[in-house]
Amino acid sequence: MSELFWFEKYRPRSFEEVVDLEEVKARLREFVKAGNLPHLLFYGPPGTGKTTMALVLARELYGEYWRENTLELNASDERGIGVIRERVKEFARTAPVGKAPFKLVILDEADNMTSDAQQALRRIMEIYAQNTRFILLANYVSRIIDPIISRCAVFRFSPMPRHLMAERLREIARSEGVELKDDAIDLIYEISEGDMRKAINLLQVAAAVSKVVDANAVASAAAAVRPSDVLELFNLAMGGDLAKARDKLRELMYIKGVAGVDLIRVFQRELIRMQLDDDVKAEVAELLSEVDYRLTQGADEEIQLMYFLMKLGSIGKKIRVAPKKR
């Protein structure tokens, strides 16, 4: 197996290789065709293709000289706006290589910068606008100040649809000589929530153990809980069998290594699909929110989850003894 991270190994190198994001690709192609582009702001959840698209754009603009004409920075890694200013100044002082009229600065995690730092960034963008274009990458556009947004063409990136993720994972598995089961794809999608980088990394970790990757291999690789385990835990508690529910909880937490907060997340996701009356769902959802909050405040995971299971037992008992509707 190659030591290279599969996410990097299979990163698209051209617009044609990028799956999904058709509207984004169409607009960026127009910029490339015109030989010019404004400052850009790409925003959306992690793993939705922001960095990949920025690098593809650089390749399309500069061809073989894309590395010489592109500067990648991470706002979280740099030691303040002063360092970013100096690096951009040093980069922008030399002429672009080739025929391009400008160089490209890709700034990741721009939304992690303070408002003051973003104001300074805005001034940097203005100073070097003659021969430098910026692509800002952010998870949350709401954390970017308006003066920067108004100077950029803004593009929204969404999580990859399940069918496209499945298709891509199968392609990678075939290339690596891995047999990928359908239940593995289902679980990878559930865990990754459309984050393609996370999905490919999960596949690689699972494939490192076995060339046949099923849901069990994925769950083990991710230290993740399967929806079926959560449903079993839920049914045991709702049925009043708290002893077995406790044993199942401890198995998940201490043998399979599942974090309590991850259990709550899967409970929240699966609750929507459960065949329960709306008032029961609302009561369970409120209970999940209460436990989730306590966990974020540092409360003991096992105690809080046992409290949750006991409350489920009480809810189940009320349902069982409630008079039948005529």
Curated annotation (Swiss-Prot):
SUPFAM superfamilies: P-loop containing nucleoside triphosphate hydrolases, post-AAA+ oligomerization domain-like. GO terms for cellular component: DNA replication factor C complex. One of its GO terms (molecular function) is DNA clamp loader activity. GO terms for biological process: DNA repair; DNA-templated DNA replication. InterPro entries: AAA+_ATPase (IPR003593), ATPase_AAA_core (IPR003959), DNA_pol3_clamp-load_cplx_C (IPR008921), DNA_Rep/Repair_Clamp_Loader (IPR050238), P-loop_NTPase (IPR027417), Rep_factor-C_ssu_arc (IPR023748), Rep_factorC_C (IPR013748), RFC_lid (IPR047854). Heteromultimer composed of small subunits (RfcS) and large subunits (RfcL). This is Replication factor C small subunit. The gene is rfcS.
